[in-house]
From Swiss-Prot:
Transmembrane segments: none
Protein name as catalogued: Uncharacterized protein PA2026
Organism listed in the record: Pseudomonas aeruginosa (strain ATCC 15692 / DSM 22644 / CIP 104116 / JCM 14847 / LMG 12228 / 1C / PRS 101 / PAO1)
Record PANTHER family: SODIUM_BILE ACID COTRANSPORTER 7, SOLUTE CARRIER FAMILY 10 MEMBER 7
InterPro entries noted in UniProt: Na+/solute_symporter_sf, Put_Na-Bile_cotransptr
One of the record's GO cellular component terms: plasma membrane
Family (UniProt): To E.coli YfeH.
A Pfam family matched in the record: SBF_like
Length: 333
C-alpha cells in the first residue's frame, strides 16, 4: 500500500534522524574538520549534478512566458521578504531572535526546482514554464539571496560583505553547476538513466550539511537556547507564511488574467523555498555554529510545504478531471 501524501517522506525522516544524531553524537575536533571537507565536496557534486540534469531545451521552451516569470520572481524575491518583515510584530513573540533570523533567511531563498515542477505536473499546470521559472529562480538566488540576506539580517550583524558572499557562492555552487551544464552533452544521458541512484547523492549532500551544521550548533548549546515552546511557535509561523504565500500567489495570478495552467505554475513556483539550495547557502553565508538555527525554519517549512502542496495539487488535478468529464458529457445531454 502506498504512503499517503500528507505523511513525511523518507528524506524528511532521514533529516529528522540526522538532527537527532547530531544532537546525541555531534562531530567535533578533527572529525568535524574531516566532515567539513567531505561536505564541501558533496555540495560541489550536488550542484554539478543539478547542472547536468537540467535540460536547456526545457528552459528555452518556457522562456517566452515572461509575464509569468516576472510574477514568480517577484513573489520569490520581493513578496516573501516583505512578508517576513511585515509579520515581525506577530512572529517575534512566538520564536527566539535566532529563529526569527532563520525565518528572514528562509524568505530570501530561491524557489525549489524539483518539487515545484513535480507538483505543477501533478496539478496539470504549465510544466515548461515551471521548469524555466524554478531553474532560473535557483540561478538568480546565487546573486539575489546574499544581497537580500544582507538587507534583511545586516542590521543584526549576522552577515559579512554581500559581494564576498556572492563570490563564495559562485565558486562553491555556480561553478560546479555550470560545469555540469557544459558536460551535459556527454554525461546527460547517463545522468538521466541513473536518476534514482543519483538522488541519494543529492540527499546525502544535504544530510551531510545538516549533520555538520547541527553538530556545531549543539556544541554551542542550540537546544538550551531553543525552548520547545519556540519550536511550536516556529511551526505556526511557517504555516502562516506558507498560507499567505499561497493565497497571494493565487489572487495575483487570477487578478492579472493568467490561465488556470499558468495559475498553477505561479502558485507552486512562487510559494516554495528550496532546501537543496538553502542549506548549502547557509553554510557559506553564516558561521558554522549559526547554521543550525538558520536552517531549522527552512527544514520545517520544507516539510509543511510538501504536505500542503501535495493536497493542493491533487485538488487542482481533480478539478481539471471533473471539468474534462463535464465537457465530454455535454454533447450527449
Amino acid at each position: 500500500m502506498s504512503r499517503p501524501r500528507f505523511l513525511p517522506d523518507n528524506f524528511t525522516l532521514a533529516l529528522i534522524a540526522t538532527v537527532l544524531l547530531a544532537t546525541f553524537l555531534p562531530c567535533s575536533g578533527q572529525t568535524a574538520v574531516v566532515f567539513e571537507w567531505v561536505t564541501n565536496i558533496g555540495i560541489g557534486l550536488l550542484f554539478f549534478l543539478h547542472g547536468a540534469k537540467l535540460s536547456r531545451q526545457a528552459i528555452i521552451a518556457g522562456m517566452t512566458h515572461w509575464r509569468l516569470h516576472l510574477l514568480v520572481f517577484a513573489c520569490t524575491f520581493v513578496m516573501f521578504p516583505l512578508l517576513g518583515l511585515a509579520l515581525k510584530p506577530a512572529l517575534s513573540p512566538m520564536v527566539t531572535p535566532e529563529l526569527y533570523l532563520g525565518i528572514l533567511f528562509l524568505c530570501a531563498l530561491p524557489a525549489t526546482v524539483q518539487s515545484s515542477i513535480a507538483f505543477t505536473s501533478l496539478a496539470r499546470g504549465n510544466v515548461p514554464a515551471a521548469v524555466c521559472s524554478a531553474s532560473v529562480s535557483s540561478l538568480l538566488g546565487v546573486f539575489l539571496t546574499p544581497l537580500l540576506v544582507k538587507l534583511l539580517l545586516g542590521a543584526e550583524g549576522e552577515t559579512g560583505n554581500a559581494l564576498d558572499a556572492i563570490g563564495k557562492i559562485t565558486l562553491q555552487l555556480l561553478v560546479p553547476f555550470i560545469a555540469g551544464q557544459v558536460l551535459r552533452r556527454w554525461i546527460g544521458a547517463w545522468v538521466e538513466r541513473n536518476k534514482p541512484v543519483l538522488r541519494y547523492v543529492d540527499q546525502g549532500s544535504i544530510l551531510l550539511v545538516v549533520y555538520t551544521a547541527f553538530s556545531a550548533a549543539v556544541i554551542q548549546g542550540l537546544w538550551h537556547e531553543v525552548p520547545w515552546l519556540a519550536l511550536l511557535g516556529l511551526t505556526v509561523a511557517c504555516c502562516v507564511i506558507l498560507a499567505l504565500a499561497l493565497v497571494l500567489t493565487t489572487v495575483l495570478a487570477r487578478r492579472l488574467g493568467f490561465s488556470k495552467e499558468d495559475e498553477i505554475t505561479i502558485v507552486f513556483c512562487g510559494s516554495k523555498k528550496s532546501l537543496a539550495t538553502g542549506v548549502p547557502m547557509a553554510k557559506v553565508l553564516f558561521a558554522t555554529s549559526a547554521v543550525g538555527p538558520m536552517v531549522l525554519p527552512l527544514m520545517l517549512f520544507h516539510q509543511i510545504q510538501l504536505m500542503v502542496c501535495a493536497v493542493l495539487a491533487q485538488r487542482y488535478a481533480r478539478r481539471r478531471d471533473d471539468a474534462a468529464a463535464a465537457l465530454a458529457e455535454a454533447p450527449s445531454r
